[in-house]
A protein has these predicted regions:
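Active-site neighborhoods of divalent-metal-dependent phosphate/nucleic-acid chemistry enzymes
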Residues: 70-134
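Acidic, PIN/NYN-like endoribonuclease modules and their adjacent C-terminal/linker elements
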Residues: 22, 119-157
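Residue-level detector of structured alpha->beta connecting loops
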Residues: 37, 64, 107-110, 140
């Protein structure tokens, strides 16, 4: 099971793999959704509704089943992650960050996080010590990017 982060959707549709060019990628991701092999927490949808492109927002509305509510087990796991890694949160953001919840979903379902974030070690002067890949590594939760998902699924587009 893949737990999808907002950054994956943004890079997929808004930056690198737009739907008008990479139709087969949309079909492959749709197959994962239909099979129940991927999910995103409801906070990811809220982030997309706030910062996503109009095309991405439209796509999300057509895939409402992808988004899972913040069940108690996810909330408890996310609270534990946020307590251990407080800099995962952005205090300047007007929205609640989905990051800990994305990780919690993968942790609870023995899944893999799919995020386009890079680790703090890969950044020149990171403003914080922990990003999704850093927390995943420390917690033993697998974390890959969208290209990693494509390779893991052996997709040839």
């Amino acid at each position: 099971m893949y737990s999808l982060d907002t950054s994956m959707f943004m890079d997929w549709q808004a930056r690198y793999y737009p739907l008008d060019v990479f139709r087969s990628l949309e079909l492959k991701i749709g197959q994962l959704i239909d099979a129940g092999d991927c999910a995103a927490v409801a906070l990811v949808k809220e982030e997309i509704d706030s910062v996503g492109t109009p095309d991405l927002q439209t796509w999300v509305k057509g895939h409402a089943g992808l988004f899972v509510p913040l069940a108690t087990d996810i909330q408890l796991a996310a609270a534990s992650i946020e307590a251990r890694y407080p800099d995962l949160l952005d205090p300047k953001s007007p929205y609640q960050s989905a990051d800990a919840y994305v990780i919690a979903l993968a942790q609870i379902r023995n899944g893999v996080v799919v995020s386009q974030e890079t680790s703090a070690a890969e950044k020149r002067k990171p403003p914080k010590d922990h990003y999704i890949p850093d927390v995943c590594r420390e917690l033993g939760v697998p974390c890959i990017n969208l290209l990693g998902l494509m390779r893991r699924e052996r997709w040839v587009l």
